[in-house]
Amino acid sequence: MNNHIQTAISEQGIEAYLHAQQHKSLLRFLTCGSVDDGKSTLIGRLLHDSQQIYEDQLKALESDSQKLGTTGEKLDLALLVDGLQAEREQGITIDVAYRYFSTAKRKFIISDTPGHEQYTRNMATGASTCDLAIILIDARKGVLDQTRRHSFIASLLGIKQFVVAVNKMDLVEFSQEVFDRISADYREFAKKLNVDTIQIVPVSALDGDNVVNPSDKLAWYQGETLLSLLESADVERELERHPVRLPVQYVNRPNLDFRGFAGTLAAGILRVGDKLAVLPSGKESTVTRIVTFDGDLEYALPGQAITVTFADEIDISRGDLLVDAAKKPQVTQNVLAHIVWMGEESLQPGRVYDVKLATKKTRGQVEVIRHRIEINKLDQLDASELHLNEIGLCEVSLTDPVAFDPYTDIRDTGSFILIDRLTNVTVGAGMIVEGLAAKAVAGQYSEFEIELNALVRKHFPHWQALAIGKE
């Protein structure tokens, strides 16, 4: 326990302290930027200056800074976050590192994502659950290709709030001219992104200027500190305003007298008495109970794990989607999606993969790669395949009808993963843009050939046979 927490508990009492912590709003954010822009140092500074470091951690940090530090006599705060041995030895971030801290106003979960292009898939993983992105820019270098790449990926993954931290201002003598030039360059580029708010702040993570506390060296800057921007960022309950979406995780039948359908509410506010539809079947019924471990609820909010019962006996199974009967999503076997490719082997159109969308498991294939996105310049390039860490806009066909929402509306029902059928490794992550009309099967193959092809791909996936028609 650190001194800050110990003081708060002694003043408030343990129960009051825990109650206050439980009811604070939560902001999930990620830090991203070019290599050596100071992402891990910035997080370390946030933890240090907000008094979130325990005494034993501080002692270990002092020792590690002497052995592995890259900051001379100063504490190397990046070592608080860079946990892998390879990261510490190279002074870079490889894995996605998660950290938790809180202030008097809010709780935070941080994703520290790698800056190198070969770890794009790691960054996509970190960004997929975040509400806000901190884009770091080295004041000496300005807006780089990697800055554009990280900004685009964060935007693609649905993050609508950006805080641009122009770091290492101490190395440009805290120049307002440099800051204004970088701000103008970034705002011009950001016109291409789907972002609601962009705030730009000058900082020095190494010395702590304008991170948690204001700095006299940046007297010309009249805005808030970085931490103040994070504390005041808008964390709207966006999902509560959407229609009800409840992916069925499993059928809960502990005895002959009870049959409920369990899952985590993805969107909307679900109330007893609501009329829901089951997709893809389309059957409808009324909710009679919302059951949880702690007892029945009158209503449930997004993120809650619940079990619902219905007034009618209807066929519902794992993978179905329970939705507001008056506001149903689209059901289709064909979607247009951005795919981030994570596999060592390239994505080949026509190759069949296992597909998982929310709780639904099916099979599918990429029919066409419309274009590959050159993520440094945002150019759209022709492509016949996608390689590791590449992103493309693809037409995907599935063997079963699926209900979905566009990813920009509801992440949980608008995203999917592609799984290699032989190795069971996740090789791709998809964000659905829209549904597509079904295409007619080409006539150059006989019905027997199409069925034989489907049989081979089902029972001999290691042959990596390409699809020639619908299954």
UniProtKB/Swiss-Prot annotation:
Record pathway: Sulfur metabolism; hydrogen sulfide biosynthesis; sulfite from sulfate: step 1/3
EC number assigned by the record: 2.7.7.4
Protein name: Sulfate adenylyltransferase subunit 1
Keywords: ATP-binding, GTP-binding, Nucleotide-binding, Nucleotidyltransferase, Transferase
Stretch list, region G2: 91-95
Catalytic activity: sulfate + ATP + H(+) = adenosine 5'-phosphosulfate + diphosphate
InterPro entries: CysN_GTP-bd (IPR041757), CysN_II (IPR044138), CysN_NoDQ_III (IPR044139), G_TR_CS (IPR031157), GTP-eEF1A_C (IPR054696), P-loop_NTPase (IPR027417), Small_GTP-bd (IPR005225), SO4_adenylTrfase_lsu (IPR011779)
Pfam families (alphabetical): GTP-eEF1A_C, GTP_EFTU
Highest taxon above the source species: Bacteria
Functional summary from the UniProt entry: With CysD forms the ATP sulfurylase (ATPS) that catalyzes the adenylation of sulfate producing adenosine 5'-phosphosulfate (APS) and diphosphate, the first enzymatic step in sulfur assimilation pathway. APS synthesis involves the formation of a high-energy phosphoric-sulfuric acid anhydride bond driven by GTP hydrolysis by CysN coupled to ATP hydrolysis by CysD.
Chain segments carrying region G3: 112-115
Family indicated by similarity: Belongs to the TRAFAC class translation factor GTPase superfamily. Classic translation factor GTPase family. CysN/NodQ subfamily.
Claim: Amino-acid biosynthesis is one of the keywords in the record: no
Molecular-function annotations in GO: ATP binding; GTP binding; GTPase activity; sulfate adenylyltransferase (ATP) activity
GO biological process, one term: hydrogen sulfide biosynthetic process
Annotated region described as G1, given as residue ranges: 33-40
Residues the record lists as binding GTP: 33-40, 112-116, 167-170
